[in-house]
Design a protein with these regions (language model features):
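Nucleotide-activated sugar donor-binding and catalytic core shared by glycosyltransferases
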Residues: 1-243, 253-391
Length: 391
C-alpha cells in the first residue's frame, strides 16, 4: 500500500492546488500553467507514471524547465484495467492524505480519471481542454472526455465549438469558460530555443527535404487492419516522394512494428521520441508533417502565426479540433494509401502556393496560464459553497 504521509503542501496560506499528469501531451500543454500556478498557489504536481520512459517524460521536464513532480503514483499495472484502477485508487489515497483545496487536470488521458476520487472527496475539480469531441467511439479518449467533463466542477474549453458541446451535454454554462489553447504560450516561451536547435545537423537532414512522421495512437497501432493500412501507405509515401521520412517512434509503436514483422521502406528512419525543441524545429522546416498527434492543429496554427507555416497532415478520420479545420490549418488524411498521398500532395501544394490558412483565434492567446489561475482562485470557494454546501 502506498504511503503518502510524507507528501505535504507548504501550507503558506495560499490556495493548495493538486495538478495531476500522466503523459507527454499533458506535460507539454500544462508547462506554462504549472509555472504560473507555482507562483501564485501552493502546488503539488503528481505524475501517475503512465509514460515512465525518459523519452516520453523526463526529457520534457528538462526541455520545458519544469521542476520534477513532488510525487509519482506508480500506477502502471500489468494491463489497462489494472492501470486505470490504480490511477483512481492511488490518486484517491494521495488526495485523502494531502487534502488539496482544488484539483486541476487537462485533457482526456487515463490520468484524468483521478477526478473520480476528487469528486467523492468533495474537492473542486478544474478541467482544461474540456468539451473536445470527435464523435468517434473507437477512440478511448472519447469516453474519458465525457466522464471527466461531467464530473468536473469547472470546465475550461479551448474553443466555442467545445463550449457548445458542453452546453449540449447540459453542463452549467456559468461554470464553463473558453480559455483558449495553452500551446501558443508554451511555444512562444520556447521559440528561440526551437529556432536554435541543431537537430538537422545532428541527424544529417536537409531543411525542406524530409517528411516528419508521428504515428502512435491506439486506434492506428493496436488495430491490425488499421496498422497494416497505415504503414503500407507510409511505405508508398516514401516511394513516391523519395526522401527521408523521420519517424518519431514511441516505444509501444516500435514494439508493435517489431512484433508484426512489418518491413518499413529503407527511407523510413525510426528514431526515439524527440525532445520538445528538436521536434518543433523539425516540424517548422519539414517538407510535410504527417501525424496523428492531437497537438498538430495547435502547432500548425502557431507556426503559421509566427511566419513558419508547414504542410500539416493528420492521419486520422476525425478530429476534436474542428476550429482548426475552420481556418485551414491542417488536412485530415485517413490511413489508406490513396487518401494519405492525396492529402500530402494537397497540403504541400497549398503551402507552396502561399495559402497557409489562418491562425485559429482561440489558439493565439499567450495568457492562458493567467486565465487558469484566476478561474481557479475565483471558483474554488464558489464550488465549495454552491456544490458541496461547505461553510
Amino acid at each position: 500500500m502506498s504511503d503518502y504521509s510524507k507528501v505535504s503542501f507548504q501550507n503558506n496560506g495560499k490556495l493548495k492546488l493538486l495538478i495531476i499528469v500522466g503523459t507527454r501531451p499533458e506535460i507539454i500543454r500544462l508547462a506554462a500553467v504549472i509555472k504560473k500556478t507555482r507562483k501564485y498557489f501552493d502546488v503539488i504536481l503528481a505524475h501517475t507514471g503512465q509514460n515512465y520512459d525518459y523519452t516520453l517524460n523526463g526529457v520534457f521536464f528538462h526541455d520545458l524547465e519544469l521542476a520534477d513532480p513532488e510525487v509519482y503514483l506508480n500506477a502502471v499495472g500489468s494491463d489497462l484495467g489494472e492501470t486505470m484502477g490504480n490511477i483512481i485508487a492511488e490518486s484517491y489515497k494521495l488526495m485523502a492524505a494531502i487534502k488539496p483545496d482544488a484539483v486541476l487536470v487537462l485533457g482526456d488521458t487515463n490520468s484524468c480519471l483521478s477526478v473520480i476520487g476528487a469528486k467523492r472527496l468533495h474537492i473542486p475539480i478544474f478541467h482544461m481542454e474540456a468539451g473536445n469531441r470527435c464523435k468517434d467511439e473507437c477512440l478511448p479518449e472519447e469516453t474519458n472526455r465525457r466522464i471527466v467533463d461531467i464530473i468536473s466542477d469547472v470546465n475550461m474549453a479551448y474553443s466555442e465549438h467545445a463550449r457548445r458541446y458542453l452546453a449540449d451535454t447540459g453542463l452549467p454554462k456559468e461554470r464553463t469558460y473558453v480559455t483558449g489553447s495553452p500551446m501558443a504560450e508554451v511555444l512562444h516561451m520556447n521559440l528561440a530555443k526551437i529556432e536554435a536547435s541543431d537537430i538537422h545537423a545532428r541527424l544529417g537532414l536537409e531543411k525542406g527535404k524530409y517528411i516528419l512522421l508521428s504515428a502512435h495512437r491506439e486506434e492506428n497501432i493496436d488495430t491490425e487492419k488499421n496498422f497494416t493500412s497505415l504503414f503500407t501507405a507510409i511505405n508508398k509515401m516514401a516511394e513516391k516522394y523519395d526522401m527521408p521520412i523521420l519517424y518519431s517512434c514511441h516505444p509501444r509503436s516500435r514494439n508493435r512494428l517489431a512484433a508484426s514483422g512489418f518491413e518499413l521502406d529503407k527511407r523510413v528512419i525510426q528514431h526515439e521520441p524527440l525532445g520538445f525543441h528538436d521536434y518543433n524545429c523539425l516540424q517548422m522546416n519539414a517538407f510535410a508533417v504527417v501525424s496523428d498527434s492531437g497537438t498538430l492543429p495547435e502547432e500548425s496554427s502557431f507556426f503559421t502565426s509566427v511566419g513558419h507555416p508547414f504542410p500539416a497532415v493528420c492521419i486520422r478520420t476525425s478530429t476534436e479540433r474542428p476550429e482548426a479545420l475552420d481556418k485551414g490549418c491542417f488536412v485530415l488524411a485517413g490511413i489508406d494509401e490513396k487518401s494519405l498521398l492525396q492529402a500530402v500532395d494537397t497540403a504541400v501544394q497549398i503551402n507552396l502556393d502561399g495559402d497557409d490558412g489562418l491562425p485559429v483565434p482561440d489558439y493565439v492567446d499567450e495568457n492562458v496560464s493567467t486565465k487558469v489561475v484566476k478561474i481557479i482562485q475565483s471558483y474554488t470557494g464558489v464550488v465549495n459553497k454552491m456544490v458541496w454546501r461547505k461553510g
